[in-house]
């Protein structure tokens, strides 16, 4: 049996093509990136000037001839020059840090916004195959990991390569023999990076995958805590969570191992070179073939070389995590939106006139997959203002059929028409403004009653909200709340009863004044007294509107103009009472 929490991220090589995909998000801030690059060049120039000043201070005033006062004065000027260079470098470093952080966070903000927008527009079939915890990890942790790539990773790494080349030229100009000795370190670091590349890549991918799985499982456990407590399964659930937590911890420890081994070997290679440089350079100074100041200058320039060499190795492995996150983030950004764009590039016909609509199903088929056919040749028409009750056994395709009206899914065969126009040819936003959908498995958002009824749409005034609440008979209850419409709603509406949540969801559908109402067992969770009030209100609410209602209650079926019986995905009966 497959694990529902299994990581579905692709396994593949890290592609620099991700940078090309990232560029559209970075392009608006390219001037700031250019400024950062300019700061790096100026800072590097100052780094080269500092050792040059020290060399001339050592080989000049400190070792030269002449009066002591003049030599001290010259040494002081050299000291001031070195201090000025150091302060200027520190100031530029501060500005560089601010700019890179500013740039990185803005790109991250735009990526996260695009990713969330893509998740909102992805088809239901995509979301049904994912877990909320995985997608949350993509939008939060994975996107944040890109900051290392955007802020300093690529820019700093490219500049470090240029820096290494420039420093090598200077080292060979100062002393060819010592320069040849120092460059022996570079191939060693490159070899180590290549050796650990594959293992580090796999380790980081494993960490991202395990973390996503743990988040998914955590979200499900929190959502199902009542069921866990009711059946006394706290210990069993805690044990399962401990197993997944342990797997995540083991994945992190694997990355720590690769980091530790890599950094230790690189550091060992660089320190060995430093010892050799001290021996050979010191010998040359004692033999008089190399000036002390020149040796100090070479030593400091070697620091400018070894630093970037080590940082390149570190960044290469740190960037593995960023590229692993890129793999997931851009995988989601590539997920097609639903509804898909029209082949001719048009936005879709405008929605037909407002008013009670004619809803027609013409030989409609629907399948969730090659071997998961749900609807087969469904044909019927709901005339304007007519209420049709859809009944049938579990699994007959009732909920699927209703979802096709507002184009939550597309039929795989035949067509669904609104006032004679295929819903696939209508503007999706205008179509859904005309069709209101109320599901049995409703969802209330964290916020206020007002937010949930008008669904965060500020153009819907409170008068319309009160009218919708009155229609479903819950306005007195809302008025009794201490804060009325501003009363807080907990996550998933946990502060209200199931029946109250259902009525609020029904008011949400009515507040947009739809032409077509699609009710999927909308009264299933309401008690008999509340249902009696609702049925009376529905008679007025449905007047002048077309309605498709999935219902099991006899009272709901009796109120319908027609009854449609589904069985095995087919219409087996269609008629009145």
Residue ranges of predicted features:
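Transmembrane helix-loop-helix hairpins at lipid-water interfaces of multipass membrane proteins
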Residues: 33-92, 172-177, 272-275, 286-292
